[in-house]
Amino acid sequence: MSKVIHKWKSISLIEENVTLPTNVVVKHTTINHPGAAVILPITSSGKIILINQFRPSLKKWLLELPAGTMEIDETPLQCAQRELEEETGYSATSFQSLGQVTPLAGFCDEIQHLFVAKDL
């Protein structure tokens, strides 16, 4: 059994029965997320570009790397290129993948694709 409890843009809150490796069935709630790209932009002089964003869920400003949610049919690289330009005004000619992380794996299926952007 799987049901959508709430949906916002491309993110859903899903409740479903999951069979654990021990064959025990539990009800689990997951945030279904399309994935994201996180970019480490480095200027030709070796400086890292960060952005200052207000995060309503924490009610404070945070200094962050540029990042954003993948759009439908968008590759991780395309997302990284788009987000870098949208959030910083910079574009890069060189993107290197650093792999991926799943920072909230206990309750969210989001995969964050990590990139270094150079030649801004």
Question: What name fits each language-model region?
Answer:
Residues 91-98:
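A short coil-to-beta-strand element that immediately follows conserved catalytic motifs
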Residues 28, 37-82:
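Conserved Nudix-box catalytic region and its N-terminal flanking loop in Nudix hydrolases
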